From Swiss-Prot:
HAMAP family: SSB
Organism: Synechocystis sp. (strain ATCC 27184 / PCC 6803 / Kazusa)
Lineage of the organism: Bacteria, Bacillati, Cyanobacteriota, Cyanophyceae, Synechococcales
Gene Ontology cellular component terms for the protein in this record: nucleoid
Gene: ssb
Disulfide bonds: none
Keyword annotations of the record: DNA-binding
Pfam families in UniProt: SSB
InterPro entries to which the protein is assigned, alphabetical: NA-bd_OB-fold, Primosome_PriB/ssb, ssDNA-bd
Protein name: Single-stranded DNA-binding protein 1
Length: 121
C-alpha cells in the first residue's frame, strides 16, 4: 500500500494565475506560504507551488488573493523538464490540489493582503 497525501494551511504567496485551454480544461497556479510551529519568530515560511485543475481552479482564481488564508489537500508530484540553455534535466516539486478550503473572513483576507510576505523566494 502507498499513500501520497498532503494537508497544508497557509497564506497565498501571490495572486493565482489561471489558464484556460481550448479543450475546456482550466488550471490555476500559485504559491502557498506555511509557517512552521517553532519558538523562533523570525523563521521564514516554507513555500509550496500549487496546481489546481477544473472547477476548483476557477474558484481559486475568483476568490484567492495574495495573503488569503487557505487550507489544501492534495498529492505531491514532480514536474520534469530540460533546461533550454544547458540541456540539463530539471525538476521541481508541485502539490496537485484536490480540495481547497477558503479560511477566514473577508476582513481577515483584507488584512492579510497587507502582510509583508516577500514575493517569491
Amino acid at each position: 500500500m502507498s499513500v501520497n497525501s498532503i494537508h497544508l494551511v497557509g497564506r497565498a504567496g501571490r495572486d493565482p494565475e489561471v489558464k484556460y485551454f481550448e479543450s475546456g480544461n482550466v488550471v490555476c497556479n500559485f504559491t502557498l506560504a506555511v509557517n512552521r510551529r517553532t519558538s523562533k519568530k523570525d523563521e521564514p515560511p516554507d513555500w509550496f507551488d500549487l496546481e489546481i485543475w477544473g472547477k476548483t481552479a476557477e474558484i481559486a482564481g475568483n476568490y484567492v488573493k495574495k495573503g488569503s488564508l487557505i487550507g489544501i489537500q492534495g498529492s505531491l508530484k514532480f514536474d520534469h523538464w530540460e533546461d533550454r540553455n544547458s540541456g540539463t534535466p530539471r525538476s521541481k516539486p508541485v502539490i496537485r490540489v484536490n480540495n481547497l478550503d477558503l479560511l477566514g473572513s473577508k476582513r481577515d483576507n483584507a488584512e492579510a493582503t497587507m502582510n509583508n510576505y516577500p514575493e517569491e523566494f
